[in-house]
């Protein structure tokens, strides 16, 4: 096997080797290819990047060329438009008016065009020479094919070594020299920018006659045409030029330099156009844009990057010179070699050198102005006279016509002409002067402190003014216009580059006028009349001192005036705001007249001869003569100032008469107040506002009109504190006395009593609480009505006005009721007798506490005034409709009439005759009345909360009542108890009739609902105001938590079933109850009993109630102690900790809320140890059948009557149990229920507060209303015999122990 493998290896070894070599070669080749691909990729990407860069450069170059071409075409278009017009100005020397920059193409071309147009009558030089701009100027001429030798220093305008062309060379000689060539080819010579390439023609100035103008250089292109095409036209045109008068003069054409060799002569053809109008709207617009841009650059400078780039091409920028007097501005170009002066107008050398020597110069770059000191910037430099360059004498006529003449030397027509031509030469129409003035009038050279000579106002400002204003003095100046100014001042005046001083002043004044006109909308506020001149003389002081004293002369009729000068344009912002405020006041004075002090000052300044008419908006207003300040008297009507000696008049509007009446009334009222009287206007206002018999005499019987407060104080001692007689006293005492009298006067004549103030404060608090609680408007009126006492007949007779007592008052709610019943329906009202008893009891209780007192009629507050009849009726109707809507919605109105009939007649008469027993019953009024039977809990989803207003009032009455032992009278307690029982009966009836439930008013309300089967009460309120009083005997139900008797629990209803179903259910429940435990829940009678309580079936007479008393003073205490059954007390041992907590006033521990009792989760204290509470299968919500409710209630009240008559002499402490209950007890015993162990034990009196105490029922339970209360009013349940909220209790019907005890106590 090994030999075979070796053989195979020997034979196949070359194959393996070759294969390995091949793979290695492939790998190397792949790596090499990848490496080369990467390198190629990098090279490719670099190439793409370079291509993009090159493309961008090409695009930028083409874009720059296109932009340059467009920029070059704009001047060409401008010049073509200018040449197409026929404008022939009357003045020359316009170069300095357009631009100071010698390299500006537009201004140079425009200057030459204007000059040639001025000379067109003599020479007819063609403006076609100005066809193209300098940078793109093309020279088209027939030349030979030989090349030119360009000079690198060609077209150097700033060189002084330029040769001068002989002065005797004429146009014909040049033409003959150029037309010698016969064969020539058209060649295009392009003049490029000398700053970029440096290959230009070298041009030099030529000496000319006095009437000719010197060109700054050959900036215009010369068009040289082919001879074959233009020979005839050229000869004809040259002949015309020779015949013209201007052929003797020399043209501004400069020949080529000797370095330019021309082998073939060329023919020059100069073509001219007919003169046409020059300024068209488009030309004006372009010139305005150009000048505006140029002046903006001169003021603010070019952008930083543009300036830096220009500095590279212009290493020696021009330096500006300020003007002197009214001469135009020129400039100096400072070079490194020497200085040369170029002037574009003819000026004599003497004048020029005298002007240039010692003058400060200014740099060209605006950015350098703020870099150094002003002295360094404006450095003076001597300039040598250029001998090699002759300067011609100036044309004084042109200068005189162009520059504004001094004041007083020209008339109005010439001034108007100067204004027009100034705007024309500057390219600034009047519409554009505002924008330019805001740009360059505030240049660096112009300062607000600069003092300038006066000037004459132009014609367009002279319009008549509407009001006379004293003219403010302009800055003082030299008296003669020829007087020279100081050198620093001349340096400051020259800040405006191209306008003279007079032009600056004129334009600035125009801008001020336009600004004010636009701002105030007044077209002629500061205008001047054209026919007069101002006569203002000034006396000034030296420059370094304060401003000169001004002597003002005011103008007569028609004389001009003004309040503004050119200095106001340079004032700061705050001063400008003050000026605007002054103008506003001025406009107000125009309409309403001037103030008195201003009138007096004007009257002192104005003389009797300088008065003029004052139109006041076309309305004739009364004039008032100002003889004494503060006493204006009408003097008449008219529109002029009345010339009176020492007195002045001013236009006064019609409203001043009304203001005068108001001032007089105010003075009278102040005098009456100081005298201690009530002002007549106040009394009249009271008379007009108080209706009917509530007049001023009735309201204030003790305050006769016109009688001072001091006399009233003598008659009425109560007014001693209100009236303070004036006596000499100190300043502080006098101020205090006057302030006291003033305060009393400002108040109403009768102050409010303390009781009324307290009521108002209480009302305000209640309304605030109602607002915070989100109550509706229906309940916001309740607090004020509940706290205010009801007015009886005795109070009505003593009041000064009649108060109508309503027959049936509106339902009143206490603050707690208003808070608890937010969103609930209102309660029903009682009858008339009930309302009267409530009012009496409330008043008695309030008087017992000292809260009410009878106030004399004169001390009655104004707030107790009754409402008007309409207001009262509307309130009654609104409340009645709201109540009826709620009654209809909840179904109350049908059952209310059933209950009012027996309640209002029988129950009340019977309840009054019932004895109340011993005084211990009054103690139980604050305590909880016990229950004989316990109703079942209702369905929480169908519970409607209701609460009567009468019950709430009784609650507050009972809280305010003192203890029963402190009350000496028995009748008051009796009436209160009877009324309380009756109200409780009403409440129970309303609860049963509407399916509602009552909440306790004791503690703050809660919205927690009560569900059936809960082991504890979801809402256990207590009265927070009641506390445990030491030494006071407590009933069993009073656990230290407050008045449990005031607490309302849930009440149960019956289901809508007939009597047979109820009997079957009752029998079934009685059978099931014998098998259940002895503990019970809170809301149900027993856990195994149905929620249809059989006590609500009133077929049998009312039963007797097993009662016991807990008083420590009665003689029957021993009987009550012996009669206590011990088994229920023994059963109550299980919840003893809860009872001890309740007796100490501590809250009960609560368990989670349970929805159904069948869940088997009893609350704490319900089930004793070892017992369980099974669920009842019959537990369901119960309802009271509405069909038999009326008959059952009638039977119930009838049985109560019979029982009360038969038991009239029965002992109030005990009552026998009902027979039906006894029968039920016997049946339960016979069925085998466990008997209760009854070892009798005596209980000590202090055990009534312990957990083993037996509950007791007092004598008031004998009253019909209380029996009804005990039947239907839910009370705190008790475990065993102790009242514990939220714990189980023993039912006398289903608990065999109680039934057995009742049977043993009351044998049949």
Swiss-Prot record:
Source species, domain of life: Eukaryota
Comp. bias (Acidic residues): 1107-1117
Listed transmembrane segments: 7-27
UniProt keyword annotations, A-Z: Membrane, Transmembrane, Transmembrane helix
Subcellular location: Membrane
UniProt keyword annotation of Iron present: no
Pro residues bias spans: 465-478
GO CC annotations, alphabetized: membrane
Start and end residues of each stretch annotated as Disordered: 464-488, 627-648, 844-863, 902-927, 1005-1026, 1084-1190, 1204-1254
Membrane topology term: Single-pass membrane protein
Family: Belongs to the SPATA31 family.
PANTHER family the UniProt entry points to: ACROSOME-SPECIFIC PROTEIN, FAMILY WITH SEQUENCE SIMILARITY 205, MEMBER A1-RELATED
Protein name: Spermatogenesis-associated protein 31F1B
Organism from which the protein derives: Mus musculus
Gene assigned in the entry: Spata31f1b
